[in-house]
Amino acid sequence: FKCMSEWYW
């Protein structure tokens, strides 16, 4: 899922 604007985990 999206955590911030550009990175994911």
From Swiss-Prot:
One GO MF term: toxin activity
Tissues expressing this chain: Expressed by the venom gland.
Protein's UniProt keywords contain Secreted: yes
Top-level taxon: Eukaryota
Keywords: Disulfide bond, Hemostasis impairing toxin, Platelet aggregation activating toxin, Secreted, Toxin
Keyword Disulfide bond applies: yes
Gene Ontology annotations for the cellular component aspect, listed alphabetically: extracellular region
Compartments in which it is found: Secreted
Function, in words: Potently induces platelet aggregation of washed human platelet and platelet-rich plasma in a concentration-dependent manner. It acts by binding to GPVI (GP6), leading to kinases-dependent exposure of functional alpha-IIb/beta-3 and platelet aggregation, and also induces metalloproteinase-dependent GP6 shedding from platelets.
Other remarks on this protein: Negative results: does not bind to GPIb and alpha-2 integrin. Does not agglutinate the formalin-fixed platelets, even at high concentrations.
Family designation: Belongs to the snaclec family.
Subunit structure: Hexamer of heterodimers of subunits alpha and beta (alphabeta)(6); disulfide-linked.
Protein's recorded name: Snaclec trowaglerix subunit alpha
Source species: Tropidolaemus wagleri
